[in-house]
Amino acid sequence: MVESYETQNRIMCEVKSFNCPAYGKFCNDSHRLATLQLEAEVQNWRACFTAYVSAQKAYIEALDGWLSKFIAPEVELYSRGRSSVPRPIFSGPPLLVICRNWLAFLEKLPEKAVTYTMKSFEKDIRALWVQQGEEQHQKRKVDGLASELDRKVLAFQRAESRILESKLHEHESQANVRSRIEYLTEKKAMLDMFRKRLDMEKEKHHNSLQVTQHVTVNRFPTGFSSVFESLLGFSKASEKMYADLLAFGKNAKVLDEEASK
């Protein structure tokens, strides 16, 4: 597991230098769905990790409780000492010593660091999902305004054509033509204002897109790296724990054999 997490962490560090094919593209429903699925997987990952650690503790506690029933009171008292926290001491049957040491070591494993980084990463994923929703909302707003602008431009062009045609008819009064031209000028001013509004919304969408890209490209690799680093630390601590347990077990067995002679 140590080698696996080291490899995964190294890959996440290298990912920062790669060009993502989706970079710069607009967010769509499939992207948001993938984000939700990733959040669910990380939540399940954390739940499985917590269950894994809890299962180990529950198993050793049950085994310790069962073995304690066969230990004489004086040995039991000496094994526990004055502290309620199990200590790696060599007294009592070897199996009981291993259980006590195992429980003590399990409590010292950095499991909280792992769950903390996973929860932090889940928050980053949720923040991305929300940001993707805001980007999509802004994109729909821009698309709607763009369609409306096209309709307004088409209506303006038709009105402009009718006014130009009316100028060619001699029976059309100058006052009526002037009124239509003023109407057209007013509509053109409104059209220009609408274009400015659309440009402002496009700028908002561009900014929203940049925020989405920043979260995806920067916070995601960092979040994954933090998770793998914490798991790497947990795995190394676990590796050392089992090595120490093996050493304690051998020493306890030797002492037990010497005491029985």
Task: Label every model-predicted segment.
Residues 1-261:
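Extended alpha-helical coiled-coil scaffold domains characteristic of the BAR superfamily
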